[in-house]
Amino acid sequence: MGGKAKILLVNGPNLNLLGRREPGHYGHHTLDQIVKELQDESTSSGVVLEHIQSNAEHELIDAIHATEAEFIIINPAAFTHTSVALRDAILGVSIPFIEVHLSNVHAREPFRHHSYFSDKAVGVICGLGAQGYQFALQSAISRLKAKSAEH
């Protein structure tokens, strides 16, 4: 890749409670631990990883609008099932993205089965815990390298 590619990692509401909140569904890793591991991996791959977590929808939208990233990894959390505005923000910037969920949303309550993002995502990873973020990052880096090789 010529220059350092950027990936924006977006984490939605309540993910700041990882490690304490319902560990049976979400695991014992904290968000800080997950982000640190991803930053280490991205740095070793020559990619810049920017991260935002917010419980406020408008802050996530503003970060997406302002990003210069070439790829987005997003765990919209509860906004998955409710936020047309967040969906529109991602579609508005035309940046490819992967949707990640720690738990298997399809094995949970029926209201969690619908996503406003999945139909537009490059891929969806759910139910693999914190490792799902690693898979998303590896895929994003691979796609960015392939895109760079084409140019």
From Swiss-Prot:
Pathway: Metabolic intermediate biosynthesis; chorismate biosynthesis; chorismate from D-erythrose 4-phosphate and phosphoenolpyruvate: step 3/7. It is an enzyme of class 4 (lyase). The keyword Oxidoreductase does not apply. It comes from the Bacteria. The active site is at 26 (proton acceptor), 101 (proton donor). InterPro entries: DHquinase_II, DHquinase_II_CS, DHquinase_II_sf. Keywords: Amino-acid biosynthesis, Aromatic amino acid biosynthesis, Lyase. The record marks 21 as: Transition state stabilizer. PROSITE patterns: DEHYDROQUINASE_II. It holds the Pfam family DHquinase_II. Substrate binds at residues 75, 81, 88, 102-103, 112. Its EC number is 4.2.1.10. One of its GO terms (biological process) is amino acid biosynthetic process. GO terms for molecular function: 3-dehydroquinate dehydratase activity. It catalyses: 3-dehydroquinate = 3-dehydroshikimate + H2O. Catalyzes a trans-dehydration via an enolate intermediate. NCBIfam families: aroQ, PRK05395.1-1, PRK05395.1-2, PRK05395.1-3, PRK05395.1-4. Homododecamer. Belongs to the type-II 3-dehydroquinase family. This is 3-dehydroquinate dehydratase.
